Amino acid sequence: MESQRNILLIGLLFVSFLLWQQWQADQAPQPVAAAQTQSSIPASTVADSHSSDVPDADSAVPEAITASKELITVFTDQLEIKIDPVGGDIVYSALLSHKLEENGDDPFVLLEQTNDIYYIAQSGLIGRDGIDSSVKGRAHFDSASREYKLADGQDTLSVPLTYVSDKGVTYTKSFVFTRGKYNIAVDYKINNTSDASLQVQMYGQIKHSIKKSESSMMMPTYLGGAFSTDDIRYEKYSFDDMADKNLDDSTLGGWVAMLQHYFVSAWVPPATEKNIIFSSMKNGLANIGFRGELHDIAPGSEQVIKSEFYVGPKDQKALSVLSPSLNLVVDYGFLWWLAVPIYKLLMFFHSIVGNWGFAIILITLTVRGLLYPLTKAQYTSMAKMRNLQPKLAELKERFGDDRQKMGQAMMELYKKEKVNPMGGCLPILLQMPIFIALYWVLLESVELRHAPFMLWITDLSVQDPYYVLPILMGISMFVMQKMQPMAPTMDPMQVKMMQWMPVIFTVFFLWFPAGLVLYWLVGNLVAITQQKIIYAGLEKKGLK
């Protein structure tokens, strides 16, 4: 009977998890209409030390403009980038090592401007002597070439854009790319050859047209903003949050990002400077960005203002190098403390076997091995409970409907026979958090995107295209159920639920990532093997 109760407990916990997950999605506000506008960020968002001549954020940070016909194209080993010489904005990015479709040739495009989506990374100089303004327009930069390419044997590539103001001040905006990396150093060098001091302030922001995340009950994903300050290590700030309230946070360092499934774009200003983290929503565009410190540049002097922009996969190692908290955009949910070691163990096994499917199998064997002492105690407790059934039936006949006396007598019997009636539940309770944590690891880790296993399983991060694994998983549950006969004391409703449980689980798992179904299937097969071994030992001790 304990086995049946355990399976029912699995079902209850599993369904509860799915319902809780769907409730979270349902409670989230729907995206606002594209035409909705918000008031500008007030001038108070500028740090107190700033001059009153600095315009407010909405006028200082220019609106998006149509890209120039002649874009500057940059090729590295990882990126294809297009830069608009008007303003020097990054208006297109293709990730050459990540394909749009499995086994396809086209790269995954993150930043782009099309009829369906507007997603760019904008940066500029504002302030009294800034060269970017929604009133005066953007700086028109000159470039020595319309195409740059990282050559073989070359580790870095610099793309300089120059602009000379009517005062004779030279502004050089440089994009520095590094082999093997997705982060771009975006620097401004201001050579003040005028006879007056200059005041400029760098900003960087990410603009994204409002659209709904392509999410489902079994594959929930997030599309929206996120930020970090010295008080808040990581917080999502959705399009709806931006519509409700503009961000206005002062911080030392920090970062802002736009997230989607597996990929991220982020501005990371200098960690030693005081920055303003802001957001706004206007004309159907969600904006999240930063404004740096106000820089005074004396006549005849030169100054460099630095920042970093990342556009690529949610690679935890690469992100943590840019900022200690940027890797948190790989969001494993409330069980992150369990998911992180699972991810690291999965990476370790993959480094050995070179296949993510076999790495998942090794994770399963490890978990089942660690839980084996508890599993053995579980089956031992179940065997003792079965042997107690005649005595329990006798107590039920003796006390009839007196539940209080019946309960007391049962507890005394359990104590006398050294049986824990809940002993069979602990392994199940421990497995569920591991299952949920692995679920988020498979869902969030870009390493699993388009990761093949064998035969027909060519992508472990999505559902089995032929539903073979879920069906095998259902069969394994049915076998486990048959190995443990129904207790005669079970009521008809429990019997019906038990009979339908493998079918219900199979239906649920049809849309789960194949890697997760593989984990559960292998876990069931190991459990069947362990059950046979443990029962053989119990029979020798007279327990059946």
From Swiss-Prot:
Chief place where the protein resides: membrane
Biased composition (Polar residues): 39-49
A GO BP annotation: protein transport
Region spans: Disordered: 34-58
Protein's organism: Shewanella halifaxensis (strain HAW-EB4)
Function: Required for the insertion and/or proper folding and/or complex formation of integral membrane proteins into the membrane. Involved in integration of membrane proteins that insert both dependently and independently of the Sec translocase complex, as well as at least some lipoproteins. Aids folding of multispanning membrane proteins.
Domain of life: Bacteria
Keyword Transport: yes
Entry-linked InterPro entries: Membr_insert_YidC, Membr_insert_YidC_N, YidC/ALB3/OXA1/COX18, YidC/Oxa/ALB_C, YidC_ALB_C, YidC_periplasmic_sf
Membrane topology summary: Multi-pass membrane protein
Quaternary structure and interacting proteins, as annotated: Interacts with the Sec translocase complex via SecD. Specifically interacts with transmembrane segments of nascent integral membrane proteins during membrane integration.
Alphabetically ordered keywords of this record: Cell inner membrane, Cell membrane, Chaperone, Membrane, Protein transport, Transmembrane, Transmembrane helix, Transport
GO molecular function: membrane insertase activity
Record field: transmembrane: 6-26, 345-365, 423-443, 460-480, 503-523
Entry similarity comment: Belongs to the OXA1/ALB3/YidC family. Type 1 subfamily.
PANTHER family according to UniProt: CYTOCHROME C OXIDASE ASSEMBLY PROTEIN COX18, MITOCHONDRIAL, OXA1
Cellular-component GO terms for this entry: plasma membrane
Protein name: Membrane protein insertase YidC
Intracellular or extracellular location(s): Cell inner membrane
